[in-house]
A protein has these predicted regions:
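Non-catalytic, solvent-exposed segments at the cell envelope interface
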Residues: 2-17, 21-28, 34-346
């Protein structure tokens, strides 16, 4: 991800962007165009993002930290790439972005968690999907926002422990950072999932081949969503398709497959619409702008907007793997394969 092996990389075919990242880039691009950013802001954004010192600070047993940028792991040397930008992208299980901070401990959870690693030298981007059910240590704040303890629980709850806005993003960001051996993030963006329906309809609907893992036809609005059927989803159906899940040990894993399928289809539809009519970027922006929260300033947004246009993926979207089981209260708990996670980070 943000470290490199001391050997030539293998090139793969390009992959399309994920839904939260597409939304994020649409916002960045429109912001840059509408604000007519001058070169000085672009240079400031580049400087602040490319000098963040984002290398992981913790190493597992059997790994030797040789210096701030180099580790020896399983007999191979890995060196941190200095021009990486690491972003955390969060899909929030909420209809709307709160107009003001909520009391700590609100019910908004992080349903989608993605780590985006941008190599600004190689113009390559890597996405890593982290299950909401991942068991990890998260900070527990008191009524004033001060951290009063630590709980080992689902990653999704890190967001709900906060205020539904920036403090929730911070708590989720810190939990993922600790999970990823101290990896630091240059920015965070949250998308409130109530905007999925509006975005879906703004691109003219999204067609998927319905996967056979959930009884959609038994749910209001899912009358035509039969397994194996090609269906152009309405906004209501799109949200149902990417949010509904069974309550068993594999329910979230199956839902993540549907989310990935929908993301790819949505991106194809959005790209086709923008290619045929560049002005359609503005309606897409208007459709989702009220549902996005980010801590990136204008300079960083502008720099990322210009960089993202030429970036591609190498390989599939990666996933943090582990063993899922039902825990207390029939809650799904995913115990991470720590060795596989560190190999993934490398």
């Amino acid at each position: 991800m943000e470290q490199e092996k001391q050997e030539a990389p293998v090139q793969g075919k390009k992959k399309r962007l994920s839904t939260p990242l597409l939304i994020f880039i649409i916002l960045m691009a429109v912001t840059a165009v509408l604000c007519a950013i001058v070169a000085g802001i672009w240079l400031h954004g580049r400087s602040s993002l490319r000098n963040g010192g984002t290398a992981p600070t913790v190493t597992p047993g059997g790994t030797e930290q040789l210096d701030s940028y180099t580790v020896l792991h399983d007999g191979k040397y890995y060196r941190y790439k200095e021009h990486m930008v690491n972003l955390l992208l969060i899909g929030v299980d909420s209809d709307n972005k709160p107009a003001a901070p909520l009391p700590y401990g609100s019910d908004n959870q992080a349903d989608v968690i993605l780590v985006a690693a941008l190599d600004t030298d190689a113009n390559k981007m890597t996405l890593i999907s982290v299950s909401r059910d991942t068991m990890c240590d998260i900070g527990v704040p008191d009524d004033t926002g001060e951290i009063s303890g630590v709980a080992h629980t689902q990653l999704a709850l890190s967001f709900s422990n906060g205020d539904g806005l920036y403090e929730s993003c911070r708590l989720c960001r810190e939990a993922v950072s600790q999970l990823f051996y101290g990896l630091q993030f240059d920015g965070c963006a949250a998308f409130y999932m109530g905007g999925i329906g509006r975005l879906n309809d703004a691109v003219g609907g999204v067609t998927v081949n319905v996967l056979d893992d959930y009884p959609f036809t038994n749910v209001p609005g899912g009358w035509n969503m039969y397994p194996g059927q090609n269906v152009t989803l309405t906004g209501q159906q799109a949200r149902l398709y990417i949010q509904a899940r069974r309550g068993d040990a594999t329910g979230n894993e199956d839902r993540m497959q549907r989310q990935k399928q929908y993301m790819l289809a949505l991106i194809g539809q959005a790209k086709a619409r923008v290619a045929s009519s560049p002005a359609s970027v503005l309606p897409l922006y208007n459709a989702v702008s009220d549902y996005v929260l980010t801590d990136l300033d204008l300079g960083k947004l502008t720099y990322l907007a210009t960089q993202a246009a030429g970036m591609s993926f190498s390989g599939d979207m990666l996933r943090v793997t582990g063993q899922a089981a039902l825990g207390d209260g029939n809650r799904v708990e995913l115990t991470v394969d720590q060795e596989a996670l560190y190999d993934l980070i490398l």
